[in-house]
Amino acid sequence: MLGAATFWGLMAPLGKDAMNNGINGVALVMFRILGGATLFWLASLFVQKENVCRKDIFLFMLAAILGLICNQCCYTIGLSLTSPINAGIITTTMPIFALILSALILKEPITPKKAIGVALGFSGAVLLISTSLRMAGVNGVGSIKGDLLCLGAQLSYTLYLTIFNKLVKRYSAFTINKWMFLWATLLLFPFAFPSVQAISFSQISLKTYLEVGYVVVFGTFICYLLMISGQRVLRPTVVSMYNYMQPVVATIVSVSLGLAALTFNHFIAVVLIFIGVWLVVRSKSKRDISSSR
């Protein structure tokens, strides 16, 4: 999970730079989905084959809608509108969504520590978005629409982690990913193909092609392989906590490449979100409370 979060953190500035140089957001999502499907089906030829029941194949389609299509479309299009720093910071809100959805769906208790963590994390997200709203139009700062889309990506992925946690534990990472990416490709292709056609490929630089290659191979294939492997043995909240690394990596790389501007409010937002998520992760689960009685 740590490796996946690090690769994803680096993907934000590289993906942003690719979208600044001729690759539109919808096309980049299509490249990720189609590239991921191709790589996972090829890789599955070299691992032990698993039989998947028909009901689970249908469930993989629903999982693909939440975990891939909604998540990647919202995040990538949001990243094209906002700064890599904002996108990276917003990814740290996922554990907060995990807490809320775990309470609603899995009936996990909301303790005072959890409640304080949610409040602090929400405050950090609001500060980040309000900063973008005040400074919209300033190069490298971001946009309210982009921030909200990135936030929606975290919500859709948290729904996927919570709802399909049992499904993921029944199969290997290769089986899960090859079916999810296949479904996502079939569902997204009719809508995304016009955006791919609109790209002037002859005008794209080698640097941009390499950035897209990183997004597909490392930011998609490797990351989802590592993430699913971790998800099979970890709880949704623990999986989501590794998003800590993403804003750290994204911020360092973005500022180094001159892709984003760093403001004081970004520091405050990061501190609030980190403290909030730390409190959420440190709080007791339903099982912990039951065992202590």
Descriptions of predicted regions:
Residues 18, 28, 32, 78, ...:
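Hydrophobic/aromatic residues within transmembrane alpha-helices
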Residues 7-12, 41-91, 127, 216-234:
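Specific transmembrane alpha-helical segments of multi-pass solute transporters/efflux pumps
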Residues 30-31, 72, 87-93, 163-186, ...:
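Helix-helix packing/entry segments at the starts of transmembrane helices
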Residues 40, 61, 110-133, 188, ...:
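Hydrophobic transmembrane alpha-helices of multi-pass small-molecule transport proteins
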Residues 1-27, 31, 138-166, 186, ...:
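Glycine-/small-residue-enriched transmembrane alpha-helix faces in small-molecule transporters
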Residues 22-30, 52-58, 130-156, 193-213, ...:
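Juxtamembrane helix-entry segments on the extracytoplasmic side of multipass membrane proteins
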Residues 35-39, 90-104, 119, 183-187, ...:
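Alpha-helical transmembrane segments of compact multi-pass small-molecule transporters, enriched
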Residues 20-70, 97, 156-163, 178-196, ...:
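Transmembrane alpha-helices of multi-pass small-molecule transport proteins
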